[in-house]
Swiss-Prot record:
Belongs to the thioester dehydratase family. FabA subfamily. Its main location: cytoplasm. It holds the Pfam family FabA. GO terms for biological process: unsaturated fatty acid biosynthetic process. One of its GO terms (molecular function) is trans-2-decenoyl-acyl-carrier-protein isomerase activity. Pathway: Lipid metabolism; fatty acid biosynthesis. Necessary for the introduction of cis unsaturation into fatty acids. Catalyzes the dehydration of (3R)-3-hydroxydecanoyl-ACP to E-(2)-decenoyl-ACP and then its isomerization to Z-(3)-decenoyl-ACP. Can catalyze the dehydratase reaction for beta-hydroxyacyl-ACPs with saturated chain lengths up to 16:0, being most active on intermediate chain length. It comes from the Bacteria. Its EC number is 4.2.1.59, 5.3.3.14. One of its GO terms (cellular component) is cytoplasm. It catalyses: a (3R)-hydroxyacyl-[ACP] = a (2E)-enoyl-[ACP] + H2O; (3R)-hydroxydecanoyl-[ACP] = (2E)-decenoyl-[ACP] + H2O; (2E)-decenoyl-[ACP] = (3Z)-decenoyl-[ACP]. It comes from Pseudomonas putida (strain W619). Keywords: Cytoplasm, Fatty acid biosynthesis, Fatty acid metabolism, Isomerase, Lipid biosynthesis, Lipid metabolism, Lyase. This is 3-hydroxydecanoyl-[acyl-carrier-protein] dehydratase.
Length: 171
């Protein structure tokens, strides 16, 4: 069976309901916390480290929920949502690889913010470069990522770590 290498908004919504990778396996959050509209490319090869990459997008409109509350009179997308989107995508990669369990963000190395997403923006693009996938007692991916708005890079994150767990009882 050939793996799918791009995913629509409807595919991602199916993933948020647990219908894409099967019950008990990696899910994306449901809207409003789903910070991705489509994955335009996912591969087990390529990227900066030759171990896999993802490219995904979020369409920006002035009526997105976070602009009304962050900040009143000075609307800007919270940087933590861009960081969470990168974790979401690393977890999606693990599910796409067929690794069982529920995804959990486990941390990151250095995160830098040097730009912002305003209501006038059109599109956010996420680029994820897989550095390593650990398979065994702990199934985990480590990746570097970046967030761009309308073609300009505005955030970077190193060593994004996400694991998948068949039980989160002792987490």
């Amino acid at each position: 069976m050939t793996k799918q290498h791009a995913f629509t908004r409807e595919d991602l919504l199916r993933c948020s309901r647990g219908e894409l990778f099967g019950p008990g396996n990696a899910q994306l959050p449901a809207p409003n916390m789903l910070m991705v509209d489509r994955i335009t490319h996912i591969s087990e090869e390529g990227g900066k480290y030759g171990k896999g990459e993802l490219v995904a997008e979020l369409d920006i409109t002035p009526d997105l929920w976070f602009f009304a509350c962050h900040f009143e009179g000075d609307p800007v997308m919270p940087g933590c949502l861009g960081l969470d989107a990168m974790w979401q995508l690393v977890g999606f990669f693990l599910g796409w690889q067929g690794l069982p369990g529920r995804g959990r963000a486990l941390g990151s190395g250095e995160v830098k913010f040097f730009g912002q997403v305003l209501p006038t923006a059109k599109k956010v693009t996420y680029n994820i470069h897989i550095k390593r996938v650990l398979k065994g007692k702990l199934n985990m991916a480590i990746a570097d990522g970046s967030v761009s708005v309308d073609g300009r890079e505005i955030y970077t994150a190193e060593a994004l770590r996400v694991g998948v767990f068949t039980s989160t009882d002792n987490f």
